[in-house]
Amino acid sequence: MDHRLLEIVACPVCKGKLTFDKENQELICKLDRLAYPIKEGIPVLLEPEARSMGMDEGR
């Protein structure tokens, strides 16, 4: 994931900052506890595609 891209993308729900989870290939919104998938190198920033994170994830 290009770090320059992380500087400009935002969570589509809260407009907050996203972090990259290299292991799971997801962009994480810690505020909303949502994980957006990255498919074939392209972030899928659609709320219906996001996965709700468990309480123990993303800490």
Swiss-Prot record:
GO cellular component, one term: cytosol
Protein origin, superkingdom: Bacteria
Family annotation (InterPro entries): Trm112-like
UniProt xrefs under HAMAP family: UPF0434 (MF_01187)
Entries under PANTHER family matching the protein: PROTEIN PREY, MITOCHONDRIAL, ZGC:162634
Family assignment from sequence similarity: Belongs to the UPF0434 family.
Protein's name in the database: UPF0434 protein VV2354
Species this protein is from: Vibrio vulnificus (strain YJ016)
